[in-house]
């Protein structure tokens, strides 16, 4: 019997509650390349030392519980426990601090975002010793990254499939998102694609309701795609939302989309869940479908500044679970600081290697090695007059997703799509000629209007 599992008669076991920091606060610990690292914003209850609360977070999200247990002697806590290895104050916040926690890799199932989140955030957020807790960032080690397939195809493969290069892609969400019949819905899809958009989109809550069952919608949208492709000579797509009440039904809808020969399907990855999303991503890679991801429900998790998770964590998790596009919001009209933070997680979606940069909200250097990139989707209240700023800020590897900015055109859907395409091509051309989009954007759009139908 090994020393760590041996028990001896007459040797007493000292039960009872002890301070977490005695076991889980280890400021001398040197992190390993294989550790998953987490940065938590901690708001403790009054009178509790930061070291104790940081250690409590490490304990309750790994091997710890509220009391000493005799079965601790049957394993190696030094191998499996989480460690709070550093604490730093939050500038301007007297009652908050950042606790850095290192988790040994063996705590996590390979290739499972579900298990990773269940461990790190599954229980500790209800800990009554904390007033609030927010997961600001994660460092995913290369050894764990390599256990994930990630996006079904990635940015370069998508461009090759679409044969579209050198500019952002254009999309539009069909409005009204609920209430249209399948045939009228398909008509709107055709008009937008025929007008010059690359994609149209189901909204997040378009699934299979009584007014429009999913199979009917898929058929009429496929007809619109093929008709617009024949008339424009361009490859088109519509994000067919495969999200369903069961994983089996979701895959059935994706199979039907593949049989129709359309290029892309869609999933609501937070409401659908990471297990369902990873399953769909694997199916899409195996069957040549692109996968568009909507982040419905994200604000429930990431909107509060002191509690929940920052969206950069959800974005990293999506890249691991799998998706070729994900909505990232838009920074048009926002404060400069928010712009930097948004572009920080946009780079985490697209780039292979991202350096630590606290000014952009990036707490850890992240190496994605061979995991494909994800196209950020800039959406939320944008229109053609935002096009210069969007082109400059997001660059070519992005999707500019309109809604009312296309459908709301006074002349109708097709002219709205034409306006989007003309504005984009004018901005890309001006940028390539060396013009300043920030200073000359309005004039560039006005010049383009003269030649727009």
UniProtKB/Swiss-Prot annotation:
Catalytic activity reported: 2 (2R)-3-phosphoglycerate + 2 H(+) = D-ribulose 1,5-bisphosphate + CO2 + H2O; D-ribulose 1,5-bisphosphate + O2 = 2-phosphoglycolate + (2R)-3-phosphoglycerate + 2 H(+)
Co-factor note (free text): Binds 1 Mg(2+) ion per subunit.
Modified residues (N6,N6,N6-trimethyllysine): 14
Key word Lyase present: yes
Catalytic center residues: 175 (proton acceptor), 294 (proton acceptor)
GO cellular component, one term: chloroplast
Entry's Gene Ontology BP terms: photorespiration; reductive pentose-phosphate cycle
Residue ranges of the propeptide: 1-2
Molecular function per GO: magnesium ion binding; monooxygenase activity; ribulose-bisphosphate carboxylase activity
Residues annotated for substrate binding in this entry: 123, 173, 177, 295, 327, 379
Record PTM N-acetylproline, positions in chain: 3
Cofactor: Mg(2+)
Range of residues in the leader sequence: none
Localization in the cell: Plastid, Chloroplast
PROSITE patterns attached to this UniProt entry: RUBISCO_LARGE
Physiological role: RuBisCO catalyzes two reactions: the carboxylation of D-ribulose 1,5-bisphosphate, the primary event in carbon dioxide fixation, as well as the oxidative fragmentation of the pentose substrate in the photorespiration process. Both reactions occur simultaneously and in competition at the same active site.
Family: Belongs to the RuBisCO large chain family. Type I subfamily.
Quaternary assembly: Heterohexadecamer of 8 large chains and 8 small chains; disulfide-linked. The disulfide link is formed within the large subunit homodimers.
Protein name: Ribulose bisphosphate carboxylase large chain
Lineage, top ranks: Eukaryota, Viridiplantae, Streptophyta, Embryophyta, Tracheophyta
Protein encoded by which gene: rbcL
């Amino acid at each position: 019997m090994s020393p760590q599992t041996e028990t001896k008669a007459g040797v007493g076991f000292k039960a009872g509650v002890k301070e977490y920091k005695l076991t889980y606060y280890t400021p001398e610990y040197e992190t390993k390349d294989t550790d998953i690292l987490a940065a938590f914003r901690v708001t403790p209850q009054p009178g509790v030392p930061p070291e104790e609360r940081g250690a409590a977070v490490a304990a309750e999200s790994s091997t710890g519980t509220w009391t000493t247990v005799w079965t601790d002697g049957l394993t190696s806590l030094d191998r499996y426990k989480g460690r709070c290895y550093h604490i730093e104050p939050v500038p301007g916040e007297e009652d908050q601090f950042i606790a850095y926690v290192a988790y040994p890799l063996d705590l996590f199932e390979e290739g499972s975002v579900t298990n990773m989140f269940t461990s790190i955030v599954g229980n500790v957020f209800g800990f009554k010793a904390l007033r609030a807790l927010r997961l600001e960032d994660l460092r995913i080690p290369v050894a764990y990254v390599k256990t994930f397939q990630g996006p079904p195809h990635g940015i370069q493969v998508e461009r090759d499939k679409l044969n579209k290069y050198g500019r952002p892609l254009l999309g539009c969400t069909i409005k009204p998102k609920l209430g249209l019949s399948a045939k009228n819905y398909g008509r709107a899809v055709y008009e937008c694609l025929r007008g010059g958009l690359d994609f149209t989109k189901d909204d997040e809550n378009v699934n299979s309701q009584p007014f429009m069952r999913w199979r009917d919608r898929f058929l009429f949208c496929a007809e619109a795609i093929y008709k617009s492709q024949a008339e424009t000579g361009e490859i088109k797509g519509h994000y067919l939302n495969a999200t369903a009440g069961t994983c089996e039904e979701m895959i059935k809808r994706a199979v039907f989309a593949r049989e129709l020969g359309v290029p892309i399907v869609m999933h609501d990855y937070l409401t659908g869940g990471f297990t369902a999303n990873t399953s769909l991503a694997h199916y899409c890679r195996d069957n040549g479908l692109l996968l568009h991801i909507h982040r419905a429900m994200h604000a429930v998790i990431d909107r509060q500044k002191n509690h929940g998770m920052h969206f950069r964590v959800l974005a990293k998790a999506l890249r691991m679970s799998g998706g070729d596009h994900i909505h990232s919001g838009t920074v048009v009209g926002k404060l400069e600081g928010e712009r930097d933070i948004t572009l920080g997680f946009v780079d985490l979606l697209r780039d292979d290697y991202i350096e630590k940069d606290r000014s952009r909200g990036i707490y850890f250097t992240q190496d994605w090695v061979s995991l494909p990139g994800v196209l950020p989707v800039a959406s939320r209240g944008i229109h053609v007059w935002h096009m210069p700023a969007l082109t400059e800020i997001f660059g070519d590897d992005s999707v500019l997703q309109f809604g009312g900015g296309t459908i709301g055109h006074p002349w109708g859907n097709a002219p709205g799509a034409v306006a989007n395409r003309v504005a984009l091509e004018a901005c890309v051309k001006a940028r390539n000629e060396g013009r300043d989009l920030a200073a000359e954007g309005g004039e560039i759009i006005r010049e383009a209007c003269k030649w727009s139908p």
